[in-house]
From Swiss-Prot:
NCBIfam families per UniProt: PRK05330.1 (NF003727)
Protein name: Oxygen-dependent coproporphyrinogen-III oxidase
Keyword Oxidoreductase listed: yes
GO cellular component: cytoplasm
């Protein structure tokens, strides 16, 4: 069984960041990604790219990082006590895209690799990641396309993989205090090492490479739909849920902040504008109610 090759993972992730940024810019008439290179105090660093003020994307961030540390923070060892006291390397690409048009969903993707080492002991490593979609005014055909693409990413690795990681995504991206999912899900996996390094790495690449196939057709179909103040206000209200999840539940955010990560890069996932309204409820029979009734509970979107 091949050992972990973090340099190969890092090379793939840098290429993935580049290809995703280039593809997203093709949907944007004027705004471009601005790059910010940074260093991590304990070792390593990253390459953050942010696009803001666009006609298609109000804000989007695509972050690459490769950081080192002398010990893993509590968020990483809570369910893996054998990792306590180990030095670590973590590398990944994480992105969140917040479109301007409320008919275009917000999307999130993340692919990452952890390596935890201790002198004289066998390295412990794992992959994690996935992608998920958060619509405001959903179209069923878009959600089916998203999940079909997610299933295609998984099929070469077994027919049980998509149902397993789809269910994990539904469970992970759930706001307990709201009793609703963050969106319509997709894929989520973590602690993946049971297939060995090469097969696990191949799966990571498949997930990373299918993100654009899942998202760009939806952007292209919906970005020119006319909208008004009502739709914009609802988008901003629902973005508040995104903020709540990221600051209360998200393990990646907690890990980054607890490990002394770069705050600007960690919090770039937050939308540029979000609203909260006290005890707001959608009108009965409205498009806004449709989201609540049909899209914010776990659901099987594909025929078996």
């Amino acid at each position: 069984m091949a050992g972990p090759d973090i340099e190969a993972v890092k090379s793939y992730l840098l290429d993935l960041q580049e290809s995703i940024c280039n593809a997203l810019e093709t949907e944007e008439p004027r705004a471009r990604f601005v790059e910010d290179r940074w260093e991590h105090a304990a070792g390593g660093g990253g390459r953050t790219r942010v696009l803001s003020g666009g006609e298609t994307f109000e804000q989007g961030g695509v972050n690459f990082s490769h950081v080192r540390g002398a010990s893993l923070p509590a968020s990483a060892t809570a369910h893996r006590p054998e990792l306590a006291g180990r030095g670590f390397q973590a590398t990944g690409v994480s992105l969140v895209i917040h479109p301007l048009n409320p008919y275009v969903p917000t999307s999130h993707a993340n692919v990452r690799f952890f390596l935890a080492e201790k002198e004289g002991e066998t390295p412990i490593w794992w992959f994690g990641g996935g992608f998920d979609l958060t619509p405001f005014y959903p179209f069923e055909e878009d959600v089916i396309h998203w999940h079909r693409t997610a299933r295609n990413a998984c099929l070469p690795f077994g027919e049980d993989v998509y149902p397993r990681f789809k269910r994990w995504c539904d469970e992970y991206f759930f706001l307990n205090h709201r009793n609703e999912t963050r969106g319509v899900g997709g894929l989520f996996f973590d602690d993946l090492n049971e297939w060995g390094f090469e097969r696990s790495f191949a799966f990571l690449r498949s997930v990373g490479d299918h993100y654009l196939k899942a998202y760009l057709p939806i952007v292209q179909r919906r970005k020119a739909i006319p909208y008004g103040e009502r739709e914009r206000e609802f988008q901003l209200y629902r973005r508040g849920r995104y903020v709540e999840f990221n600051l209360v539940y998200d393990r990646g955010t907690l890990f980054g902040l607890q490990s002394g990560g770069r705050t600007e890069s960690i919090l770039m996932s937050l939308p540029p504008v979000a609203h909260w309204r006290y005890d707001w409820r959608p009108e009965r029979g409205s498009a806004e109610e449709n989201l609540y009734l049909n899209y914010l509970k776990p659901k099987e979107w594909l025929e078996s």
